[in-house]
C-alpha cells in the first residue's frame, strides 16, 4: 500500500519530504484520500473499511485510521511517498468536523476504543492532557475526557 501526498489550497498537513515506512506510531496522520492499494492483499487479509466510522456513520471519523491500523496489524507493508496524487480545494464545509464539540469527543472516544481496546481510556486521558491548552480550551479537558469515555463505553457495550 502507498500513501501519497496531497496538494492543498490551504495546506494543513505536513508535506512528505522523503519515502518512509508507515508504522504503528504514525499511521493516524494519513487520510483515506491519500491511499492507493492493491485490492487482492487487502481482501486476502480480510480487511475492509469499518462501516460504523466515517462521514455519515454513527462515529463521524476515523475509518481511515482503523483501516491502516488493521493493515499494519495483519502485516501489510505501507509506504509514504512525497508524490502528490491530487489537489484538494477547501471550498466547502467539512461533512464531519463541526468544531471541538460533544460529538467530536464522543466519536474520538469510539475511535480510541476500536483501535486501542483496553488502553483506550489511557490514550484518551493522554490526549486530553497533551492538548489541554489548545483544543480543550472551551470545553475543559475533564469534560472532554468524560465525553470520550462515553464513546469508549458505547463501543465496548456494542451500542454502535
Segments (PLM) and residue ranges:
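A conserved hydrophobic position in a structured secondary element of the catalytic/binding core
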Residues: 37, 63, 81
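Non-catalytic, C-terminal membrane-associated alpha-helical segments of glycosyltransferases
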Residues: 99-160
Amino acid at each position: 500500500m502507498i500513501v501519497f501526498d496531497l496538494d492543498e489550497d490551504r495546506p494543513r498537513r505536513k508535506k512528505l519530504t522523503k519515502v518512509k515506512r508507515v508504522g504503528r506510531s504514525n499511521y493516524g496522520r494519513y487520510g483515506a484520500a491519500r491511499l492507493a492499494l492493491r485490492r487482492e492483499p487487502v481482501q486476502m487479509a480480510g480487511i475492509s473499511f469499518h462501516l460504523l466510522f466515517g462521514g455519515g456513520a454513527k462515529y463521524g471519523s476515523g475509518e481511515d485510521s482503523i483501516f491502516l491500523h488493521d493493515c499494519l496489524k495483519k502485516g501489510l507493508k505501507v509506504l509514504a511517498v512525497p508524490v502528490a496524487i491530487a489537489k484538494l480545494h477547501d471550498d466547502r464545509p467539512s461533512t464531519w468536523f463541526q468544531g471541538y464539540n460533544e460529538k467530536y469527543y464522543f466519536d474520538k472516544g469510539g475511535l480510541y476504543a476500536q483501535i486501542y481496546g483496553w488502553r483506550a481510556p489511557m490514550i484518551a486521558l493522554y490526549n486530553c492532557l497533551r492538548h489541554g491548552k489548545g483544543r480543550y480550551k472551551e470545553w475543559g479537558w475533564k469534560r472532554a475526557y468524560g465525553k470520550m469515555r462515553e464513546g469508549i463505553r458505547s463501543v465496548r457495550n456494542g451500542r454502535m
